[in-house]
Amino acid sequence: MKDIYIFAIESSCDETSASIVKNGKVDIATTINTQIDTHKLYGGVVPEVASRLHLENITLVIDETIKKSGMKMEDMDAIAVTYSPGLLGSLLVGVEAAKTLSLVYNKPFIKVNHMMGHILANNIGQDLEYPLISLVISGGHTDLIYMENEGTFKYIGRTLDDAVGECFDKVARILDMPYPGGPNVEKLAKEGKCTIHMPKILDDGSYNFSFSGIKSHVNNLVHNMKQRKEEINKPDIACSFQTCVANSLVEKSLAAIKKYNVKNFTIAGGVASNSYIRESLINMCKENNIKIFIPDKKYCTDNATMIGAAAYVLYKKGMFSDLNVNASSHEELSLEEL
């Protein structure tokens, strides 16, 4: 069988990335240009700044990826790009670059949902087994998704307010920690102990999540301690917060696994790089004889390799797009789409 090479582009937020992926599983070459140092100056991602930096870097990232691979664009079987969801201005840069490559080199064009990319990052270097439950945890999403087979998605739970990564960032700001908040909260939590009471997260029997309550609890806790001029034990707050969040993710995931009677589980998204949360979910699977699939940490945060992995599934299904595709800031995965 002929090897399939897909050139993929990712620009949904604050990383400009390009990758060449073979057969949806082998990372031939990947380049990532991160904007973290720039956005750190503003305390978070500024959409207008992000899109301008994507414009400055997209050509360099594409050229560097081709150079590292030793291949030519003519060797590619398709061009793929993240078209949704994400920051609209950022998405547009990647989409237009991919359209241009598709047109100039006469290659099939594949639009990829960003969340599909995160989930199928688990295909890189390993073979997913179905049916499965996937937990997608990132700055914009906290979703439980049932996949009966490759390329089918059914939402069974989601956040009702803040996404888990967003909550980490907001708690980091409450604790006067710099951007990016999530990794800094995780680092601080390692220095603390779980000594502070945190409220149960949406214990309603559903598979949905809600993080606004624990965020408000931490905010009120810190505010009241400041008012009373008490010493604020930031490591213990971070540790207690992180433990509470991890427990909620474990409880909801396990409930979904049992409900759908599956033996396979994946985690995906940027928050999946959090070591404590990873270990909590790994232990859950060990204790319940569930096979867990986890991407390498470098494939958890935004990258084009995961887009190439997802595009391969669409390639096999013949799901190509015309060049009239537009970027969209909000578009969900659906069974009907695939």
What is each stretch, according to the model?
Residues 138, 149-191, 215-224:
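Glycine-rich phosphate-binding loop plus the immediately following alpha-helix
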